[in-house]
Amino acid sequence: MSEQPVLDTLADMTAASVDHNSLSPREYMLARVAALVAVDAPPMSWLANAPAISESGLTAEDIQGILIAVAPVVGGPRVMAAGGHILRALGIAIAVADAEIAEAELAAAEDGQS
């Protein structure tokens, strides 16, 4: 059994929903970000979606546009909360990716010295 069965299950559900829709990956993530804002998703939900958001090619401007578009429907406080969650999640995701790249470069350098 996995050490993180809940996260693994959520990742499987996300992968299945990506595979079974007619949207492009970019359109899919536009809709997903809007939904996360609308349901006032907690930081962990944003963190779980951060890799897919990054991989879809959404820019900071795209996310800003989503926040502006949904603000009249979901309200200012939700948009403000989402902004903070997005910043933390994407910041963490970037830091993790940077650490993984650094580890890979270090491993490659060590292999080259052997």
Where is each model-derived feature located?
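Acidic, glycine/proline-rich low-complexity segments that act as flexible tails and inter-domain linkers
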Residues: 1-30, 38-55, 79-114
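Winged helix-turn-helix DNA-binding recognition segment
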Residues: 58-63
